[in-house]
């Protein structure tokens, strides 16, 4: 299966590329969708305001791809920009694929949050969490999505969404490519979800 990893022009994309390739995806890094992919991946690098502006410029193309059955994976910031809006870098509109607002973690904890936290499965309507409940995944973030609709969550001062999904998009606040065996299990589950 073909995956296009969208390059926002910042950060190292090779670890997420390698993680996707390990579970069977043929990955190409590009500034724009290729048009023949099965999956578009929005990586977790950059700031919400700049990245959401860049991705919203492609929203019509994304909608065409969705109608064709293309699936989307957002990692960390890539998940956050799938929500209605975010405050990092000033209030900005997201893609609006999930209801909710992305804001700083509202708690007296050290930020950024860097490290391993446990996953708790909430309600998995997308069959993405087999083998994940109670396992640890790796986070690097200061912002979270404030929403009540999530597949799995973690806790750091507050409970926050770790995995979200709908019929065409999946988002993870954690970095599967940095989450060792648990990350690989998630990416395998995602591969199976795309194949369905």
Curated annotation (Swiss-Prot):
Primary subcellular site in the record, as a coarse category: cytoplasm
Annotated EC: 4.3.2.10, 3.5.1.2
Localization per Swiss-Prot or TrEMBL: Cytoplasm
Catalytic site: 76 (nucleophile), 175, 177
Domain Glutamine amidotransferase type-1, first and last residues per copy: 2-196
Catalytic activity: 5-[(5-phospho-1-deoxy-D-ribulos-1-ylimino)methylamino]-1-(5-phospho-beta-D-ribosyl)imidazole-4-carboxamide + L-glutamine = D-erythro-1-(imidazol-4-yl)glycerol 3-phosphate + 5-amino-1-(5-phospho-beta-D-ribosyl)imidazole-4-carboxamide + L-glutamate + H(+); L-glutamine + H2O = L-glutamate + NH4(+)
GO cellular component: cytoplasm
Entry keywords, A to Z: Amino-acid biosynthesis, Cytoplasm, Glutamine amidotransferase, Histidine biosynthesis, Hydrolase, Lyase
Tree of life domain: Archaea
GO molecular function: glutaminase activity; imidazoleglycerol-phosphate synthase activity; lyase activity
Gene Ontology biological process: L-histidine biosynthetic process
Pathway assigned in UniProt: Amino-acid biosynthesis; L-histidine biosynthesis; L-histidine from 5-phospho-alpha-D-ribose 1-diphosphate: step 5/9
NCBIfam families in the record: IMP_synth_hisH (TIGR01855)
Role: IGPS catalyzes the conversion of PRFAR and glutamine to IGP, AICAR and glutamate. The HisH subunit catalyzes the hydrolysis of glutamine to glutamate and ammonia as part of the synthesis of IGP and AICAR. The resulting ammonia molecule is channeled to the active site of HisF.
Quaternary assembly: Heterodimer of HisH and HisF.
Protein name: Imidazole glycerol phosphate synthase subunit HisH
Gene: hisH
């Amino acid at each position: 299966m073909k995956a296009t990893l969208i390059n926002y022009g910042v950060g190292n994309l090779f670890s997420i590329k390698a993680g996707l390739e390990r579970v069977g995806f043929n990955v190409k890094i590009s500034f724009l969708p290729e048009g023949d992919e099965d999956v578009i991946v929005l990586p977790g690098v950059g700031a919400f305001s700049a990245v959401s502006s860049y991705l919203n410029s492609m929203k019509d193309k994304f909608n065409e791809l969705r109608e064709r059955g293309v699936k989307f994976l957002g990692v960390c910031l890539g998940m956050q920009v799938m929500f209605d809006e975010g405050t990092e870098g000033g209030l900005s509109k997201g893609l609006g694929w999930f209801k909710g607002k992305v804001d700083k973690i509202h708690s007296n904890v050290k930020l950024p949050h860097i490290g391993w936290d446990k996953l708790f499965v909430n309600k998995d309507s997308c069959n993405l969490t087999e083998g994940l409940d109670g396992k640890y995944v790796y986070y690097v973030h200061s912002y979270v999505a404030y929403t009540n609709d999530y597949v799995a969550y973690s806790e750091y001062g507050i409970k926050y969404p770790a995995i979200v999904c709908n019929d065409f998009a999946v988002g993870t606040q954690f970095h599967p490519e940095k989450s060792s065996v648990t990350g690989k299990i998630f990416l395998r589950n995602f591969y199976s979800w795309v194949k369905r």
